[in-house]
Each structure stands twice: as structure tokens, then as C-alpha cells.
Amino acid sequence: MDDDGARSKTIHHDGGVIVTHDERKISAEEVCVLLPTLDEEATIGDVIDGFRDHGYTNVLVVDGDSSDRTREIAREHGARVLIQSGEGKGQAIREALEYVDVPYVLMADGDGTYDPADADQMLEPLGRGYEHVIGNRFANMDDDAMRRLNGFGNRLINRAFRFIHGANYADILSGYRAFTVDSFDRLSLDSDGFTIETELAVECVRQGVDTTVVPVSYAARPDESETNLHPIKDGGNIILALYSLAKTNNPLFYFGSVGVAALLSGIGVAAYVLIRSVYFGVNHEILAVVAAAGILLGVQLLMFGVLSDMIVTLHREQRRRLERVTREFNRKK
């Protein structure tokens, strides 16, 4: 890849380890603007024009078989259009990446809520060696851009993500992303729907993708544009995804949380059986068996969680060593 600007060394701290990066200017020709859409005829033209006005002419619209004129308008405004073969935003993104022939992707929604003027600052960290950038909508959000229920749900999900997966990405549900194609190829993504942003964040943690957050503007949807998001249903799916994805990223939490619940339930039932037997002379043999099973299951799940966490930690350490050796080898070439 040719350099389009001067290189210089920058240093940042990552988890107490000093990491050095080559700094370079990323040219617009190296970037594909990816816009997943579904029935966005009211806004897609202005979104495409906004990115093109800022020099990003390589725009790929991946459309979920819209019933309106989204595709026609996108073509009229100079974008390439891909009709996804499956359903859901996650599947659309995975399929679209197969048609990207440049090293960097800038992803946004086609509803006009994200500002194309933020494109340069989204891409700037990639020039410093980061592999994935998340745009933080809460840094500069219009007052009417998010309903109160949606805002509460977003903050709850971000806190749950920090607690379960141990990283603070500020706004994991943001659809404004910039990333390298190489880092995307390392991620194991299965989500088809709106849980794709959650899965991206979890996979960045699990795979050790160098990720940072930048502030972006977030505006309200135009009145003529309708959202495809269902807050209760999709919010529930996202919470379940956070827990499910902990299986391979934080197995101690995944198995331990169920183990603690089973253990406490078993102890509670055992206490009830003991009190009834001592003070009332009533024996509950079946409940005693249930209590013993709950305690045994809880202990086993906790032990399994600890062992799984040790394996995951060892795997991460081996991966870091391999990546360090690879970097040193490439540096000497």
C-alpha cells in the first residue's frame, strides 16, 4: 500500500503497555463507504451526496430488498448498489465486505442521522494504527435524536457490556464505524439482525482488535424516514447476545452466573428443608434431593467457568505472543 502522507511515530498506552504506531494520512481512494439500507428513499440521496462532497466517492449501498426507490436513488447519486441475498443488517454487512476492494471501510446508516463531515475524524485513528473505530453518538447528540426509552436502553446495554466483557467502548450500538478489512476478516460474526454492532464490539475484545472511540454528531431521523428498529424486541435480543457471546469471551461470567444462581437456589431450598425438619418435624425428601442437585450443579458450573476462563486466558496470551513475533519478523524484513 502506498503512503499518501508523511509517517511519524506515535505512542499510546494500552492496558499499561506502551504501543507504538506508524502515523499516516489515509486517502479517500483507500476507503469504501458502506451504507446498509432498507426503505431509505427519503434520506439515502443526501447521505451519499454528503460523503461524496467530502471526497469519499467509493460508496457501496447494500440494500435489503427495499420496497421503495432506495436503490434507484442510490444509483442516481453515484453509489454502487448491492442487493443482499439474505435478510438482516448483519448478513448485509458480511456480504458487502466481499465486494470491498480497498483496505478501509467507513460504515454508516442510510437514514441521515450520522454526519458525513465526521468521516475524516473517524478514519484518523486508523492512520495511527488502530484497527476499529466506534463513533460515540452521546458525545454530540441532538435533544430529539433518541427517545427516552431508547436512550435508557442504550446506556443499560453499554454498562452491561463493560461489566460482562471488560471494555469501555462508550457506545457499542453505534452504526458509525471505521475499520480495516484485515481486522474484519479476523472476526467471527454470525449475527444477521441489529445485534451485529454488539457482536462487532464483543469480537473486537475477544480477538484483541485495537479499538478506539471518537465523538460524532447524531441527529434525529427526518420525519419522512421510518425506523426499522423495534426497541423492546431488538433490545431484548441485544441483551441475550451480550450474555451468549460471553461463552467464548468471558466464560467465568457465562457459566458462573448460572452456577451462582443454582448454588443459591440449592442453599435456599436446603435451608427451608432444614427449618421444616428441625422446628416442625416435617421431612421433605424430594426437596432435599432438589437442594442437593442445585448445590452440586452450582459448584460444577463454577468450577467449569474457572477452568474455561483459564483456557481462554492462555489462548489470548499465546495469540499476543504470536502477534508480537509476527510484528518483529515483519519489521526486520
Which residues fall in each region the model found?
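Catalytic beta-strand/loop signature of glycosyltransferases that borders the donor
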Residues: A170, D210-Y218
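A conserved acidic beta->alpha catalytic loop
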Residues: D63-R71
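Acceptor/aglycone-binding surface of glycosyltransferases and processive sugar-polymer synthases
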Residues: Q84-Y99, Y104, P116-F194, T198, ...
